[in-house]
Amino acid sequence: MARTTPLERMRNIGIAAHIDAGKTTTTERILFYTGKSHKIGEVHEGTAVMDWMEQEQERGITITSAATTCEWRDIQINIIDTPGHVDFTAEVERSLRVLDGAVAVFDAVAGVQPQSETVWRQADKYSVPRICFINKMDRVGADFYHSVDTIVDRLKCRPVPIQLPIGAEEKFLGIVDLVEMRGIIWRDETMGAKYDVIEIPDDLKDKAKEYREHMIEAISEHDEALMHKFIEGQPISNDEIRAGIRKATIALQIFPVICGTAFKNKGVQTMLDAVVDYLPSPLDVPAIEGLDVDDPEKTLIRHASDNEPFSALVFKIMTDPYVGQLAFFRVYSGSMKSGGSVFNVAKRRNERVGRLLRMHANKREEIQEIFAGDICAAVGLKTISTGDTICDDAHPIVLEAIDFPMPVIQLAVEPKTKADQEKMGMAIQKLAQEDPTFRVYTDPETGQTILSGMGELHLEIIVDRMMREFGVGANVGKPQVAYRETIRKNSEAEGRHVKQTGGHGQYGHVKIRVEPLPSGTGFEFVNDVTGGRIPKEYINPTEMGIKEALEGGILAGYPMSDVKVTLYDGSYHDVDSSEMAFKIAGSMAIKEAAKRAKPVLLEPIMAVEVVVPEDYMGDVIGDLYGRRGRIEGTELRGNTRIIKSMVPLSAMFGYATDIRSRTQGRGSFTMHFGKYEEVPAAQAEEIVSKVQGKTTR
């Protein structure tokens, strides 16, 4: 079966923004106008097509990024709707990794908000070209020009308006198209499906002329032919302007700005035009780089072509109630037929693809073959996880894995009955496969199952899904901070595990050096044993013993990280040595070495941004200081203050209720993980004695 859509007629885009900026509503309107959905879904009514999990429909937020395909002007657009809540940052990171372009949605009243900055930084990391859509132009206080200023100030980039609004707030009627120099007014009675092209209103003519000059100047800076025409005052055609905007956008030199109100059905078609005209096709972005499976130093290149070997990256795993596990992936090169076999690089095994599905939010269409540039879902891949590369087994390649942040918050869950215990095990396994920022472990002291994640909302939704989708009855504890441990100085120690009680004994003896590593590095193991003092087959078990001991912590049972361990000497016994003996010796050695290396407790510090009316600023800042917070700065926006601070997570539980009562419901805040820092001695002592008190009882 041959390809039906040429690569240059494809767009893989994401819609990303701050929570409540209107991403899902925007996507719903796109589906309506491209003819994919016959009734518009509303987020606040809980009927949005893209928000298909019960938890999403209840809360009116998007948790999973649903992938959808639609068409506009004969161009196939694959859209991924991403969550804007900071607890679901991993979803955004994952979807940006596989996209070629994005529409960044901003609220016309608030402009750039904290999560907008996070999403923007993630898009910068993956060099994703973006269009800025200033949404909610019909809201009271909507200000297009202020929003553009916040993009300059807070995102430190170059937004270039290619449209201007006609009116604002309830008088927002349409837009001025600066390329065609015409006005567009939407008709309310047709749900915005039809619009009238008008002359630019008199009061906007001068402004439109001025902004068109700015636009042409911005694009001609990156195009010599245009620059020459611009300086000479020669006429520049609309097609040349469009080509110039496209070139500068794909090169990340400018970010075109458009506006509208998705909820009131204004500006969506012109946004689709901008997606088609200015965002890249898979051919416009650099070829994907990967690593050689056998030689990680060697870089391999895969071009977006059906003739290259097949390679794809799995960016999402979901459990569908009807077809079972779905693996969403982006094809970078080659093609694959339904029922074919693929090589899973991470698991080093071949797997058969049962069916290939093209998703339309929660409806699915079966397809026979997929090609370079496609985004689709597969059924039947048994051992697949998020971030895995699947490829042609004759030409293996490792596409860049996706880095996910460490969880910062945890809670204990206990199944109510024996039957619940089995169900819970299965539910947790499936949920962890879908979401790599959700981790699970069993507390060795209490035997409780501990779930850890990116925030209170993240864990609340996981527990909710566990109970609803998998029918698990469970008692849930209060959220707690995920502390960590590390060391502050070098030390040495030896571990000797010797048991000789007649017959087959046990003998393992190791000597190690430990040293602290920079924050965020993790664990490093170096084998420096020479002269066969420890046989090769015992090196791995020694490392395993060390790793497991560090996972269990030294001070207070929290995982220890940022440690380098060098195994430099030891001894063995021909008969009595075993893998288990060396594993135990490794564990003994690291416990002793870590105790001597000044172990300390680390806590997650959150970047907290509080938005309050000016009158409450003093009180709120005083309260943040009381929570061991550091104020990083404040800025004035209208008559509200934005307070930026770094506060320990342990001091932030219940802050949502507290800030509301402190500001009579007028204050709000957002927070995301900043970094791990050492806990002050007094607090550390309290935490350690609390943990040790529990274990001695």
From Swiss-Prot:
Main location: cytoplasm
Gene Ontology MF term list: GTP binding; GTPase activity; translation elongation factor activity
SUPFAM superfamilies for this protein: EF-G C-terminal domain-like, P-loop containing nucleoside triphosphate hydrolases, Ribosomal protein S5 domain 2-like, Translation proteins
Residues covered by the tr-type G domain: 8-283
GO terms of biological process kind: ribosome disassembly
InterPro entries from the UniProt entry: EF-G-like_DII, EFG_II, EFG_III, EFG_III/V, EFG_IV, EFG_V, EFG_V-like, G_TR_CS
Keywords (A to Z) from UniProt: Cytoplasm, Elongation factor, GTP-binding, Nucleotide-binding, Protein biosynthesis
Record's GO cellular component terms: cytoplasm
Reported function: Catalyzes the GTP-dependent ribosomal translocation step during translation elongation. During this step, the ribosome changes from the pre-translocational (PRE) to the post-translocational (POST) state as the newly formed A-site-bound peptidyl-tRNA and P-site-bound deacylated tRNA move to the P and E sites, respectively. Catalyzes the coordinated movement of the two tRNA molecules, the mRNA and conformational changes in the ribosome.
Family: Belongs to the TRAFAC class translation factor GTPase superfamily. Classic translation factor GTPase family. EF-G/EF-2 subfamily.
Name of the protein in question: Elongation factor G
Species of provenance: Solibacter usitatus (strain Ellin6076)
Gene: fusA
